Amino acid sequence: MTDPAKTPSPLLSLPGAVAGDGVDAPVAAHYGSFNAEQRTLESGEGFVDLSHRDVIRISGPERLTWLHSLTTQHFLQLAPKEWTTALILSPQGHVEHAFSGYDDGESFWAHSEPGAAAALLDWLGRMVFMTRVELAEVTDDWAVAWRSRPDAPTYDLVPRGELETYAQAAGPACGLWAFEALRIARGEPRHLVDTDARTIPNEVGWIGPAVHLDKGCYRGQETVARVHTLGRPPRRLTLLHLDGTENRLPAPGTELLMGSGEATKSVGFVGSSARHHELGPIALALVKRNVPLEVTLEVDGMPAAQEVVVDPEVGLHVRPKLR
């Protein structure tokens, strides 16, 4: 099997296409103007090539009840073609896997971060036992795209051999930088970039979007329920407004500092960052819960003002606010 995550997308041949970096290198970062591309997506037009993401298919008559029992999401009443996001947690409640997908009546189709499907399928495969489900990675055959629509922007799964035809119908093409800038501004975390091995869903705003609180038991539920009931998760996701005079962005994982001189201490790390066409340079970061909201932090020598994404008191008595 080829590795589409390392194979450049055919859409990199479109006019103005510039490849991304790191795990995002197989797709276009932009097509000449990431600011204009952000405005295009905000207007409800255009699409984003996400064909470097992994795609899996889960088939069999017991697939939804099986997923319901293993994950944080409620699958029993999932409507056909309704997209949903689910997590698989460790026994201690830490996020190990994340995926988004929909059911077409015969199979559940999901996509995950580039290169993440192998570990996800390995774990799922060990949970099959006598359950009537079949697992397959289908990244060779299917590609992911994001389609901006005025009424309901959504992901599309496209036969990989038809990507160029899809682009002609769904255009104009917008790059990953535009997609990421808008995602960051919404305060939506990206798994494995804005999270680490200790992340619990309560810290990053996944209660609701990816964690259903009214369902049966699943691995890691005790931690999620306890923190939700008592409030005050150990850390919180925050949106950083970076100093616009610096013509650079912090790398994922860069340490976030508070204080000065001998009183300087590490209070978290930066994940995703981007240049937003209105907000300027922004980033998502995980910081300790007790970091004062009004304090300006520092990352890679740049001042960083905070905007609340996850309330430090979030829990049963403080509901998360959708941005």
Model-assigned labels for residue ranges:
Residues 143-151, 185-200, 315-323:
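Short, low-order "capping/linker" segments at domain edges
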Residues 158-241:
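Anionic-ligand-binding alpha/beta catalytic cores of soluble enzymes and soluble regulatory domains
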Residues 2-5, 11, 99, 204-211, ...:
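Glycine-rich, small/acidic residue-mixed loop/short-helix segments
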Residues 47-69, 136-149, 232-243:
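Short glycine-/aliphatic-rich beta-strand segments at the starts of folded cytosolic domains
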